[in-house]
Structure formats: C-alpha cells, structure tokens
Amino acid sequence: MSINIEQAIIHEISQDSQGQLRCRLRPQPLLNSQAVEAMLEELHQTYSGKAGKGFGFFGTHGEDGEANPAFADGLSQYRSGDLGFVEFTGVASKLLQEELAKYDFSQGGFLLMSCYTSMTSDYLFVALLSAKSSMTVLDDMELSQNNHLDLNNIQLAARIDLTEWQADKDSRKYISFIRGRAGRKVADFFLDFMGCVEGVNIKAQNKTLMHAVEDFVSGSELTKDERQQCRDKVFDYCSERAEVGADIELKDLADELADSGMDSFYDFASSGTYELDEEFPADKASLRQLKKFSGTGGGVTLSFDGGHLGERVIYDPISDTLLIKGVPANLKDQLDRRLKG
C-alpha cells in the first residue's frame, strides 16, 4: 500500500421519480476492508497518473467571485475536531446536490470522500463516481448483468493537499482536479460545490521552464552533447517528481544540474526574465519537448528525438524544409511499396 487510509465514505445522489435530486447518506464510514483499500489504492494511482490536471485553491467570497466557503468551512471544522467525518461529508453531499440541481445534464452518482496519507502529506480525495453495467457468468453458466463502480474512467475528481493548505494559506495550488474531456464547463459544478478557484497555470509554468532551459544551454559554452545531457537531466528530474506527485523545486533542480557541472541555472532562471514560481507541479506533456520534437499540420505528423537534430534530421529555416537521413525501416517499406505500385 502506498497510502495510509484514515477514513472513507460513500454517499449517493440520485434522481427520484419526479426527477428531483436526492441524497442518500451513509450513517457511518466504510470499514477499512481489503475491498476499500484496493479501491482507494487504485483510485490514488489512477488519479496521480492523470495528465493535464488543473490546480487551484479555496476562493474567498467577494474577492474570488461567488466562491462558496461552506465546503472549506466544514473541512476546517473537521480538521479541528469540531465536526465528525460523517457529518462533514454529509454537508458536502448536500452542497453537491444543490450545485447539481442547477444543471440539466446531471444524473447524480456516488460521492466518494476519503482522507489518507501518502508520503508525508495528508490528503482529502473527492470523486463523483458513476456505475457501469457489466456481464458475468454464474456458477450454473448462466449470464447475469450487474453494476459496478467505474474506477478506470474517473472524470470528476479532486484532491486537496491538507498539509499544504494548512501550512501555506497563500498557496494557490493545494487543490488539484481532473479536467473533463469536454472541457472545463462540464466540471464547473464540481469545482463550484467545493468553492475551488483555479490558481496556478501549470502548463504555462512548465513551458516557461522549458524556455529557460533552452536559453540557458544556448547561451552556455557547453558542447552539443553536453547541452542534450542538460536537457535529459532536467527531463529525468521533472519526470521523477511527476511520478511521485511532488512539485518541481527550482532550487533543487538547479542543484541537480550543478552536480553535473552545470552551475548558475538557479540565478539564471530566477533573474526576473522568467516568471517562474519556486515550486510548481510537473506537466508531462510540456516536459516531452526536452526529449522530442513533434508537430502536426496539413496532413503531416512528425516526431523525432531531439538528439537527431543536426545529424539525422537537418532543418533549413530559409527553405522551410526538413531533410531526414536514414528513413525508418517500416516507413521506407511503405514508401517503396507505394512507388512500385
């Protein structure tokens, strides 16, 4: 187990015969059974591996629009011991029900809330799960249809870093959330019921870091191979941080580079030219730019390792052309067949 579960509970929000949303509240937490542990471990791993998450914080009503403080207030009371876990999650369920009632598209679902510890941080995981129909074969070889929670396709989930929230009230990234496939609008109600306001632009921070790295190596006296080693070092460090759900720390990254003989990156990156936070989450999609060049347009898709630029792949910006030396065997075979045809 990579997590230590403190408490977990499930409440149901569903439509009644008149189409009105109703809450069915569980009166006690889930037992820490093997099934519960397996479910939460799977959700933790699935959520941690989700790319492109957004980050935010509890908004202040008035300063951050109409942010509802009720969820944060209830969470504060739970953390201080003034409100029980069951009572707090019941309040949260009612808040979600009220928010869902504003929209026509929602059918409700199962609200899962769990407090657990991973590494050195305490978390509150919040997810609205849906049921999925499946078929099974009974002992007498007859088919039977049943419903199960769809854990592999979570689209409405958030995780609050309770440790960061209570240690740094000015942080704007202690809440992470999944961006829905159809865009922010579908998930708005889920953020609104928690009073969450989007804070740090993670993609922008990661892209700025990539630009800083490129400018750093371009202005250095490093050889071509050493420059690529620097990019690889940054990629490896950031990827490792992403894998464990930890933030990129600018000073820590600079120390990693200094150990490899590439000094002064911290002073370079924090000089004011680049608006980089001292710490921010990693974005895997942005990090790939350190290892690969890729692009799509006009019916053409290209992708190649950065180390090939200037060797197997020659770019001429004046003629706007790419020359590829040593065409991949499977592509060459397709091209030869087409020419012969």
Swiss-Prot record:
Main location: cytoplasm
Name assigned to this protein: Nucleoid-associated protein Sden_2335
Family: Belongs to the YejK family.
GO function term, MF aspect, one: double-stranded DNA binding
Keyword line: Cytoplasm
GO CC, one annotated term: cytoplasm
Native species: Shewanella denitrificans (strain OS217 / ATCC BAA-1090 / DSM 15013)
Compartments where found: Cytoplasm, Nucleoid
